Amino acid sequence: MAVKMARRMAELRASEIREILKLTQRPEVISFAGGLPAAETFPAEDIAGVTTKVLSEDGPRALQYSPTEGFPPLRQAIADRMNAKLGTAVDSSEILITSGSQQGLDFTGKILLDPGDVVLCESPTYLGAINAFKAYEPQFVEIETDDDGMVVSDLERRLSGIPNARFIYVIPDFQNPSGNTWSLERRKGVMDLARRFEVPVIEDSPYAEVRFEGQSVPPLKSLEGNEWVVFLGTFSKVFCPGLRLGWLSAAPELFQKYVFVKQAADLHTSTLGQMQLAGYLETYGLDRNIQGVIDLYRSRRDVMLRTMEAEFPDGITWTRPEGGMFLWITLPESLNAREILELCLVEDVAFVPGGAFFPNGGHENTLRMNYSTSSTERIEEGVKRMAKVLRQAIE
């Protein structure tokens, strides 16, 4: 079938993570590949009760079309929570409900990018964002990062030489894939540059409340110059991803563009889903659920780190995240993580090769590990299997 496709389709590929997940469907495979929340944290019974209440008391509205911006009580609840927990000063009129924060990424590309424009991003960065933006045919310029976040001097150098930089995409808290969190100094430095060069910052914040230890750091959206920040949030990592509920917050002029794009894309996010979540937040709040997520993921992270320390051969380094769902491993440069993955799959264990997280390629000796999904017993066994493969590869 010879259908003539749009030029942008040449840049789109299946998500590498999704392709790997297909290989891990066998129950015996211990997968550190996906970014899946632990299903045992989903409050299914409570949601069932809330759903019954919503449908019995307000069924016609829950099953009807609703405003593009979102269900007003949910927008208010999100604004209140952002202001109380994150130190922002947003109004509910600045909250747009999206079908997961992934939709916010797609809308950002649609609004801000013409072919050939430049996206500035961390190196490495979230694979889902790379794929979302690629549809709009940009160039990616990767900014150097270290344990404290984006290197401000490198960002300044790039901004000074790139006239068509359209936005800076960042994940400052428990970054996917590295697990690192930006220091306050780095956050302020990036905001200073955003104001000076008048370039928007897209702050993707799925994990900020999943902190195991250490002090929380204010989001960019709470700092001076926050009118330049588009904040993307989601309930997928702290509630449940199947409802596909996220949000964004932006300054009024840009916010209205997101509303127009949302209208064209899907009119609005599921009314029933929004009312389910609003009812849950009103009845139970979110703190209890988040604490359960934190306690579970902390224990799983600890087992992964402890087993890696005991079993991995010399010459391998990794990050030690204070929260979130991922850590990042750097192998000796002589090793290729894709080749190691093939060997690990024979041992029924999987991860994501790190090269997928660099939009311009390279860095094939890196990989991402997820600790949120598997039990502590399976994490320990899976890391031991990986260690066996790595020892053989290094020898």
Predicted regions located by residue number:
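PLP-dependent enzyme catalytic core of the Aspartate aminotransferase-like
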Residues: 1, 346, 359-395
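Conserved PLP cofactor-binding pocket of PLP-dependent enzymes
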Residues: 29, 206, 210, 345-368
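Short, conserved charged micro-motifs
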Residues: 335-340, 377-381
